[in-house]
From Swiss-Prot:
The keyword Membrane applies. The chain crosses the membrane at residues 25-45, 73-93, 94-114, 134-154, 173-193, 198-218, 240-260, 262-282, 287-307, 337-357. Catalyzes the initial step of the lipid cycle reactions in the biosynthesis of the cell wall peptidoglycan: transfers peptidoglycan precursor phospho-MurNAc-pentapeptide from UDP-MurNAc-pentapeptide onto the lipid carrier undecaprenyl phosphate, yielding undecaprenyl-pyrophosphoryl-MurNAc-pentapeptide, known as lipid I. Its cofactor is Mg(2+). This is Phospho-N-acetylmuramoyl-pentapeptide-transferase. The gene is mraY. PANTHER family: PHOSPHO-N-ACETYLMURAMOYL-PENTAPEPTIDE-TRANSFERASE (PTHR22926), PHOSPHO-N-ACETYLMURAMOYL-PENTAPEPTIDE-TRANSFERASE HOMOLOG (PTHR22926:SF5). Pathway: Cell wall biogenesis; peptidoglycan biosynthesis. Its main location: membrane. One of its GO terms (molecular function) is phospho-N-acetylmuramoyl-pentapeptide-transferase activity. Keywords: Cell cycle, Cell division, Cell inner membrane, Cell membrane, Cell shape, Cell wall biogenesis/degradation, Magnesium, Membrane, Metal-binding, Peptidoglycan synthesis, Transferase, Transmembrane, Transmembrane helix. InterPro entries: Glycosyl_transferase_4 (IPR000715), PNAcMuramoyl-5peptid_Trfase (IPR003524), PNAcMuramoyl-5peptid_Trfase_CS (IPR018480). It catalyses: UDP-N-acetyl-alpha-D-muramoyl-L-alanyl-gamma-D-glutamyl-meso-2,6-diaminopimeloyl-D-alanyl-D-alanine + di-trans,octa-cis-undecaprenyl phosphate = di-trans,octa-cis-undecaprenyl diphospho-N-acetyl-alpha-D-muramoyl-L-alanyl-D-glutamyl-meso-2,6-diaminopimeloyl-D-alanyl-D-alanine + UMP. Its EC number is 2.7.8.13.
Amino acid sequence: MLYHLLTPLAKYMTVFNVFRYITFRTIYASLTALVISFVLGPWLIRKLGEMQVGQHIREDGPQTHLKKAGTPTMGGVLIMSAVMFSTLLWADLTNAYVWIALGVTFGFGLIGFVDDYLMQVKKRSKGLSARGKFCLQVVVAGIAGTVLVYGLNGDTTVNIPFFKNLNPDLTRPGYVLFAILVMVGASNAVNLTDGLDGLAIVPVAIAAGTYMIFAYVASHYDFATYLSIRHVPQSGEMSVFCGALVGAGLGFLWYNAYPAQIFMGDVGSLPLGGALGVVAILTKQELALVIVGGLFVMEAVSVILQVSFFKITKGKRIFKMAPIHHHFELKGWPEPKVIVRFWIIAIMLALLSVSTLKLR
């Protein structure tokens, strides 16, 4: 919005030229989202407490979690509001990629909101069914993928990390299916990771910061050519979007850090994962998400292995509990130690993913 309002004024006052620069708008998108999360956090915590929207704790989990029962949840409303407002304020709204990213974020957020609302407000034990939630995610991701591929004539090749000239073409239908897999998979992986105080939000912010770099580099022809990656002119505005994700995440962390005053709920975890997935698609760094979000992959795989092994062996388990962060808790690791060590893993994976820009 500010880009369109203030950039034309540059011919009268050169100071307004700064609004042309993606780096400037990315920084201020991040700061705006951070301030929104930071300022509105106490009000939301108090409001959710008054509404008795409190977290339900599984009795078969770590006993140390029982004291968290009743902690306000659905804090993802704050994150999503901050991200969307900040992006609308600072991004170039004529860029179709901005609307695709916001559409996926809003769509997945709405699914998470309905799920949380049914459980927390209407007191339904399970909210949306797993199948219903999955189908809705597929619909949202499918619409986004179709608009990108058919509406915008998007590139249907896939960039393979570490390989310079390996870019298989999936064809239009194949790429739409692939995009659905990336977005829905990322969304559910982040959702599974959100089980400890601050565990999910920091890796999300780290991943968003990494894709901020990918988006900026891909949008510049010289950088993209030098690094032998796909040049995506429209991806520059994804830096602004990612900046908003980073800022909103850090602002939310202030209240979500151990011991948490608020949890994000599905209304936070589902759209955050979906946002990472759609940015990966739009920047043509789809498979890099497996590295950038390796922590989320590890959490999701631990659940898949646990469930599969349990069914095959008729009752045996690989881990003490899944997702894997609970396994380490039950082994005796204090919750803060699990959280910080997982953050360290996320940082290492982010650095590795950035190295793929040059190692090819």
